[in-house]
């Protein structure tokens, strides 16, 4: 059964309607998962700071919600992911109240606390207060664009899996995911960006719903996400000091893997330029240097990314470091 949000509010002062949505859902006693900087948006409900929760004990994490009829996540990615996981394990409804828009986890059924990610259910309601979100750091909003453009290569990878590995594919989910990305790129390339935070939130929610439709991260996560995860591995392996975000890394990864599709004749030059320019317009990184990585690190990441997950992508069984360098140079990432 496909589970998608029953209520989606994306507007100014939306956070003042949390109680209204709870009433509409006949929910009376929610537990809020939030952070110290976002607790101020909580409307007097019981709360736990997300960094006080032990997430490694998946079986007992449900106990946090024992005395409550629902769970609300208020904040960025981690409070929402932890809230989603507690709600799933305790079989309670989950409401997502994002305070920024850096990735589609605000609406998807995916919990990304571990790798591989964990499938739960999409939020029953998403309440996105644009007054709050537009005040979040520009870096986070730029990262959101990176997460959305990655849908283009993710869907191409999914289609490739269908062709080369007879993988199950959902036309409705794939088309929906790709259209969301194209519409947001069209907007940022042809406007003054005044409505960018609201347009971005709508796109991220749509992307999350495409995942719920497919019951898989496939429509929004492909080779570009593998590249991002590989960079995370490099950070830890080499103790690299960089504050690059998931969405930023996915944006650069999209350019790298789109270059491979371009060389195989499976992507138009115009689409590649659209991807790159839309990232630049919102000041998202498009080079390794902007992410804070040396050339050799991104080369190693691209050549090893295929091994991080059993998922067929344009990386197939891997590419050599020489080929990785060539791709990264042609796409002007290095």
Curated annotation (Swiss-Prot):
Organism this protein belongs to: Methanococcus maripaludis (strain DSM 14266 / JCM 13030 / NBRC 101832 / S2 / LL)
UniProt-listed Pfam families: Fe-ADH_2 (PF13685)
UniProt: substrate binding residues: 104, 147, 229
Ranges annotated as spanning the membrane: none
Described function: Catalyzes the NAD(P)H-dependent reduction of dihydroxyacetonephosphate (DHAP or glycerone phosphate) to glycerol 1-phosphate (G1P). The G1P thus generated is used as the glycerophosphate backbone of phospholipids in the cellular membranes of Archaea.
Binding site for NAD(+): 77-81, 99-102, 108
GO molecular function annotation: glycerol-1-phosphate dehydrogenase (NAD+) activity; glycerol-1-phosphate dehydrogenase (NADP+) activity; metal ion binding
Entry keywords, A to Z: Cytoplasm, Lipid biosynthesis, Lipid metabolism, Metal-binding, NAD, NADP, Oxidoreductase, Phospholipid biosynthesis, Phospholipid metabolism, Zinc
InterPro entries documented for this protein: G1P_dehydrogenase_arc, G1PDH, Glycerol_DH
Co-factor remark: Binds 1 zinc ion per subunit.
Subcellular location, record wording: Cytoplasm
Reactions performed catalytically: sn-glycerol 1-phosphate + NAD(+) = dihydroxyacetone phosphate + NADH + H(+); sn-glycerol 1-phosphate + NADP(+) = dihydroxyacetone phosphate + NADPH + H(+)
Top EC group: oxidoreductase
Cofactors, names only: Zn(2+)
Family recorded in the similarity comment: Belongs to the glycerol-1-phosphate dehydrogenase family.
GO biological process, one term: glycerophospholipid metabolic process
Protein name as catalogued: Glycerol-1-phosphate dehydrogenase [NAD(P)+]
Residues at which Zn(2+) binds: 147, 225, 246
Keyword Oxidoreductase: yes
Annotated metabolic or biological route of this protein: Membrane lipid metabolism; glycerophospholipid metabolism
HAMAP family (alphabetical): G1P_dehydrogenase_A
Main location per the UniProt record: cytoplasm
One term under GO cellular component: cytoplasm
Domain of life of the native organism: Archaea
EC number(s) stated in the UniProt entry for this protein: 1.1.1.261
